[in-house]
């Protein structure tokens, strides 16, 4: 099965190739000149929903539903997601992602290029296979070092997961996780717990939660 190549042009010759999920500057969209990088999972979802609504603004509730489908997220979390995405896109003047008062957010797209041919998966090397992703529904899981801080919940902000040999960042602002719920999930083995770190195994991945740095790092075995 292949993928249709869709490339979005933003102001200042900034491009987002949805197929490879790469953001870069270029005169020719097929010849990246300066790579910005790969958007995080939350940033990718945000770009997709804003592009789907373009040229209309996307309502805040629709953005929240697209970014965090499994749980309630405050408006502050949405604001932080917008800010981080603007920072990633070098949108310091807030002209690429605009805040439309009482309507939501709108993305400034110059043009959209859609390939007429379906490309092979090899051409979309950054496409992440669902089967290769860590199978955790983060909106339904709680992680807390209850043996040490029984009443303290730890908010995990950036989460890194492993897929096709690449690191991807996933921001989970505002979500807390309960270790007891995590341990009940099928396929998860809690291996080590301390004041600073939790280690567990899931779906052929070795994962480590660092409470101080608020990160989760997973590598494929």
Swiss-Prot record:
It comes from Vibrio cholerae serotype O1 (strain ATCC 39315 / El Tor Inaba N16961). GO terms for biological process: phosphorelay signal transduction system; positive regulation of DNA-templated transcription. Residues 5-109 bind DNA. Changing residue 199 to M: In strain: Z17561. Involved in TCP pilus biogenesis. Signal peptide: none annotated. Keywords: Cell membrane, DNA-binding, Membrane, Transmembrane, Transmembrane helix. One of its GO terms (cellular component) is plasma membrane. It is a single-pass membrane protein. Pfam families: Trans_reg_C. This is Toxin coregulated pilus biosynthesis protein P. InterPro entries: OmpR/PhoB-type_DNA-bd, Sig_transdc_resp-reg_C-effctor, WH-like_DNA-bd_sf. The gene is tcpP. The chain crosses the membrane at residues 143-163. One of its GO terms (molecular function) is DNA binding.
């Amino acid at each position: 099965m292949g993928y249709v190549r869709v490339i979005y042009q933003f102001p200042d010759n900034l491009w987002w190739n949805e197929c490879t999920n790469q953001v870069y500057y270029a005169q020719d969209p097929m010849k990246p000149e300066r790579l910005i990088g790969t958007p995080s999972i939350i940033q990718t979802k945000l770009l997709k929903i804003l592009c789907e609504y373009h040229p209309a603004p996307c309502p805040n509730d629709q953005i929240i539903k697209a970014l965090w489908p499994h749980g309630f997220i405050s408006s502050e979390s949405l604001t932080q997601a917008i800010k981080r995405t603007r920072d990633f896109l070098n949108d310091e003047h807030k002209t690429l992602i605009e805040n439309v008062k009482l309507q939501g957010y709108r993305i400034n797209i110059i043009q959209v290029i859609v390939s007429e041919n379906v490309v092979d998966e090899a051409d979309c090397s950054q496409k992440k296979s669902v089967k290769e992703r860590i199978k955790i529904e983060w909106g339904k899981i709680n992680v807390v070092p209850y043996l040490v801080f029984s009443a303290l919940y730890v908010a995990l902000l950036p989460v890194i997961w492993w897929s096709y040999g690449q690191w991807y960042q996933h921001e989970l602002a505002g979500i807390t996780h309960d270790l007891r719920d995590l341990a009940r999930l099928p396929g998860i083995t809690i291996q080590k717990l301390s004041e600073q770190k939790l280690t567990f195994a899931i779906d052929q991945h070795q994962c480590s939660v660092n409470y101080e740095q608020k990160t989760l790092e997973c590598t494929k075995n």
